[in-house]
């Protein structure tokens, strides 16, 4: 008797619809506060961060690192800088601890999300002056 009841059940079409990945990605992207566009050469070149004041430069290897691996770099003034990179196959997420503004000032970037699509853009959620 239960089998007959189950066979006659019907469900609204919305129950069977599954949220697609692009829909969930769009909702996630809509929650971010601001967008900053980067040039592709900044991401693929040998120098990702550059500071021109008094010849100071920051160098970072452009090779992608496994998730949660930490990289330590130093500029010409011997300031120790730490960079944490997190990458996922679909979204390429990166979290950096520092960024140079071009005038010799370093900023702490708490959350930076990079999308590698037709254009590269970054979303910065909070910045502190060091």
From Swiss-Prot:
This is Putative protein ZNF815. The lineage of its organism: Eukaryota, Metazoa, Chordata, Craniata, Vertebrata. It comes from the Eukaryota. The gene is ZNF815P. It comes from Homo sapiens.
């Amino acid at each position: 008797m239960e089998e007959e009841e189950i066979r006659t059940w019907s469900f609204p079409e919305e129950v069977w619809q599954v949220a697609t990945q692009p829909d969930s990605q769009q909702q996630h992207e809509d929650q971010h506060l601001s967008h900053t566009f980067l040039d592709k050469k900044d991401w693929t070149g040998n120098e990702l961060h550059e500071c021109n004041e008094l010849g100071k430069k920051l160098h970072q290897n452009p090779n992608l690192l496994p998730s949660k691996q930490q990289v330590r770099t130093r500029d010409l003034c011997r300031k120790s800088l730490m960079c944490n990179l997190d990458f996922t196959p679909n979204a390429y997420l990166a979290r950096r601890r520092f960024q140079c503004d071009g005038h010799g000032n370093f900023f702490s970037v708490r959350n930076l999300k990079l999308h590698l699509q037709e254009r590269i853009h970054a979303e910065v959620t909070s910045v502190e002056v060091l």
